Amino acid sequence: MGRAFVHVILGGGVAAGYAALEFARRGGYSRGELCIISEETVAPYERPALSKGYLLPEGAARLPGFHTCVGANDELLTAKWYKENGIELVLGTKVITADVRMKTLLTATGETISYKNLIIATGARALKLEEFGISGSDASNICYLRNLDDADKLVNVMKSCPGGNAVVIGGGYIGMECAAALVTNRIKVTMVFPESHCMARLFTPKIAEYYENYYTSKGVTFVKGTVLTSFEKDSTGKVTSVILKDGKHLPADMVVVGIGIRASTGLFEGQLLMEQGGIKVNGQMLTSDGSVYAVGDVAAFPIKLFDGVIRRLEHVDSARRTARHAVAAILEPSKTKDIDYLPFFYSRVFTLSWQFYGNNTGEVVHFGDFTNSSPRFGAYWVDKSRIRGAFLEGGSREEYEAISNVVRRKAKVINIAELEKQGLMFAIQESQKDLPDGGLALGEKPTYVWHATAGVIAAASIAAFGYWYGRKRRRW
């Protein structure tokens, strides 16, 4: 048995939903010509909700409230929407082999699905402790967070140990956001990671110090520079303590693991070119095969801003944009230019929120107030007298736009000391100039009227401010 489609989207995450909406708006298919194949049993949804609003103790986000594409303040794509738009959802279905040459996919049920164009949106999977030689990591109170099933388990485990002790393994995105959620659920948290500070791939030590101090004020304990080696368990097999490399035992009613992800490339290894741990694509999101595209976490694509250097970006904003771009390239290849993406990352925890744009390479110039309870601080990364990256905590919409603009423009820096002195004003003034390449004018007086107010400023994508700034602010 088998079915044939013109367009197949393999994977049911964020990228799949945004690709589907782009197809529908461009009218690039007839009813029954487009399908999404997903191992999950629900239509594509906004994954950021899982580590934010989904974990709230009260008023938690639940489906259908966060199906794509509400993350961009756009349409809510429920199963009904896909049916009305002639898009077939093949849910709860695992593809076990892919034959790029024959343009076929074989499912676990034995069905063969053929395609003319394939968009690989398989995303990435969470790394598991057993991959690092840690046995016993299948205990019922050990949680990961990558999909809806993971989130449901995490919620249930949290409910089972009110006021208990949680050990969070990992100091990156998932570790930090889950730690905040655990605290909100009145669970005591200890974070363990091997690096010298949290968010080590992005944060400078100075930036990390602020967030670690803030978390500490909320009751979080940090254990840095060491790793988990084993567990102690009770007679039922539940973890009761975490044993570290230095021999320390940490009491644990639950464990949350966030030690990174790995792109889901397995079906296509040996068939498509790989780079940066993902599937290599060009500026049209096209792989080494002329009928196969890759988007989201699984895609390694050229960043124009970095002179065409290939990068694989693990963030929802990249998933949304690359998905839309691939559909445009499929339907209107002659009109679609190479993607020109500004790398963008954001997070929000407690009353804090930050955004980062560009590349964190070069000399770091910090600015702003790192001591205020309602902070507004940041950093520039400068290389060869040009702004290469920018970070801002607690900014307004206009201020986030300003730092993104100076990164995209690669604004010229004449004097590092003056850049540090002017701080955010440099970005604001540069953004107001007509010329794309203005230098830092020494002694220039700030002319910008500050719009930010104290309190919670939610993180937002420049392309999709509605995600946090829409008429009805969503709590995820």
Curated annotation (Swiss-Prot):
Bilayer topology annotation: Multi-pass membrane protein
EC number: 1.6.5.4
Catalytic activity: 2 monodehydro-L-ascorbate radical + NADH + H(+) = 2 L-ascorbate + NAD(+)
Species annotation: Oryza sativa subsp. japonica (Rice)
Binding site for NADP(+): Y173, I174, G175, M176, E177, R201, G260, E314, H315, Y346
Peroxisomal side: 25-447
TM region positions: 4-24, 448-468
Protein residues bound to NAD(+): G171, G172, Y173, I174, G175, M176, E177, E195, R201, G260, E314, H315, Y346
Family membership: Belongs to the FAD-dependent oxidoreductase family.
Role according to the record: Catalyzes the conversion of monodehydroascorbate to ascorbate, oxidizing NADH in the process. Ascorbate is a major antioxidant against reactive oxygen species (ROS) and nitric oxide (NO).
A cellular component annotation (GO) from this entry: cytoplasm
Cofactor(s) this protein requires: FAD
Pfam families attached to this UniProt entry: MDHAR3-like_C, Pyr_redox_2
Primary localization class, coarse: membrane
Cellular compartments annotated: Peroxisome membrane
GO molecular function: monodehydroascorbate reductase (NADH) activity; oxidoreductase activity, acting on NAD(P)H
Keyword set includes Transmembrane helix: yes
Gene: MDAR2
Binding, FAD: G12, G13, V14, A15, E40, R47, K52, R146, N147, D297, V316, Y346
SUPFAM superfamilies, per database record: FAD/NAD(P)-binding domain, FAD/NAD-linked reductases, dimerisation (C-terminal) domain
Protein name per the record: Monodehydroascorbate reductase 2, peroxisomal
Residues reported in the UniProt entry to bind L-ascorbate: R320, R348
